[in-house]
Amino acid sequence: MVMIHIFLTVMVVGGVSLFPETAEAIVMGPSMQKLTWHYYKVYNTCENAENFVRHQVEIFYKNDKSIAPKLLRLLYSDCFVSGCDASVLLEGPNSEKMAPQNRGLGGFVLIDKIKIVLEQRCPGVVSCADILNLATRDAVHLAGAPSYPVFTGRRDGLTSDKQTVDLPSPSISWDQAMSYFKSRGLNVLDMATLLGSHSMGRTHCSYVVDRLYNYNKTGKPSPTMNKYFLSEMAKQCPPRTRKGQTDPLVYLNPDSGSNHSFTSSFYSRILSNKSVLEVDQQLLYNDDTKQISKEFSEGFEDFRKSFALSMSKMGAINVLTKTEGEIRKDCRHIN
């Protein structure tokens, strides 16, 4: 059975222990071994660091639920480029955040606020890279995701270059997407799971219009797109016919909308050919990801557990530890 296959995959990849009662996943693969669970408590450098982060996230979330998808995107943009080193937070005319793919990134204000609080409590101790990982975990948990363990002890990168940003277009093929995830040490289950982050948040119409009007340069809409959903999207995203035309935002998952809730309805929409982005819809075009999508649409807990594992794995990509990098005093600038 597919459910058993997925569950066993989650259990054995990277030496994983799952705790069904809390839907938490602990990853002890090679990259994670450089990090420590509750690092700041274990080494008695800032015992309540994670509590301080959580408190600030809870305050912010009450006023702005969109912080969950914003932080998810920010963490993805950081980890998938040069590793989880908070380089995406650095300011500068040629920094990563200035790359076209990073247009519209958000969440910086909350990270700044958390850093200020931690510098007051434990000066020069907690890295911006750890703050970003912890804050993302706490925000998506408030939105309905599991509160997975975040291993800590990361240090902050010293450079940030927009030329290194190779984040792919949301219109890439399944094979291209799979190749990209594999290059970061992630597998097919991770890809299908992490794309589920699109269960909340928004995107610009410019990333969707080709599906609506010029799929694969045919001058026609995507043939697989549900015709009623196609009509709805066309109303929100008119053809781009002139330079400087406004670029509206649309919800990645209309079912959750402004609630920005973490749900498995994203996968139900894939199975109904109602995905907003082409990269999401293409999960239906491969036998493995199609089966995973079916499992997740039918079993929310399976999705939550897999999400916990994949987020932990993503958060360990090319981390800096020990004497590498630095602990920034200001997340936007190196010391």
UniProtKB/Swiss-Prot annotation:
Q: Which cysteines share a disulfide bond?
A: 46-122, 79-84, 128-331, 205-237
Recorded hits in InterPro entries, A to Z, give:
Haem_peroxidase, Haem_peroxidase_sf, Peroxidase_pln, Peroxidases_heam-ligand_BS, Secretory_peroxidase
Q: What else is known?
A: There are 73 peroxidase genes in A.thaliana.
Q: Which residues have a glycan attached per UniProt?
A: 216, 259, 273
Secretion signal, residue range per the UniProt entry: 1-18
The record lists the organism as Arabidopsis thaliana (Mouse-ear cress)
MF-aspect GO terms: heme binding; lactoperoxidase activity; metal ion binding
User: Which residues are substrate-binding?
Assistant: 168
Compartments, record wording: Secreted
Query: Where does the UniProt entry say this protein principally localizes?
Result: secreted
Family under the similarity heading? Belongs to the peroxidase family. Classical plant (class III) peroxidase subfamily.
The EC number(s) given in the record are: 1.11.1.7
Enzyme class, top EC level, equals oxidoreductase
In Swiss-Prot or TrEMBL terms, this protein is called Probable peroxidase 26
Reaction catalysed by this chain? 2 a phenolic donor + H2O2 = 2 a phenolic radical donor + 2 H2O
Q: Which residues bind Ca(2+) 1?
A: 78, 81, 83, 85, 87
> Any idea which residues are catalytic in this one?
73
Function, please? Answer: Removal of H(2)O(2), oxidation of toxic reductants, biosynthesis and degradation of lignin, suberization, auxin catabolism, response to environmental stresses such as wounding, pathogen attack and oxidative stress. The enzyme activity has to be proved.
Cofactor(s) it depends on: heme b; Ca(2+)
Cofactor details (free text): Binds 1 heme b (iron(II)-protoporphyrin IX) group per subunit. Binds 2 calcium ions per subunit.
Its Gene Ontology cellular component terms are: extracellular region
Q: Does the keyword Membrane apply?
A: no
